[in-house]
A protein has these predicted regions:
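Positively charged, polar, low-complexity stretches
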Residues: 1-89
Length: 89
């Protein structure tokens, strides 16, 4: 599965989690926090490529939370390289 996420559309933490939940088909019990996102990304059932477009907008709009989100996603990629590829554009 390949997913493209337009980060400039994200204005709030809620937007971030809503968009990731929808784009990655995260389970209904997803906790809407970065720890839960990390857990989901490290246990993906299939090979997934995530293209994050305009990551600087995520940092600009969410500040430290945006930086933490990018760090969590990158960490998940390092832990699950056979199933997760992240391109930050």
């Amino acid at each position: 599965m390949t997913v493209t996420i337009e980060c400039s559309e994200i204005q709030t933490k809620e937007d971030f989690h809503r968009l990731f939940t929808k784009s990655l088909y995260l389970p209904g019990f997803y906790g809407n926090n970065l720890d839960a996102l990390h857990d989901c990304l490290t246990s993906l059932p299939q090979k997934t490529v995530i293209n994050l477009v305009h990551t600087q907008a995520l940092i600009r709009n969410l500040g430290p939370y945006g930086r933490a989100a990018i760090a969590a996603i990158a960490h998940a990629e390092r832990e699950n390289p056979e199933r997760l590829t992240v391109n930050m554009l």
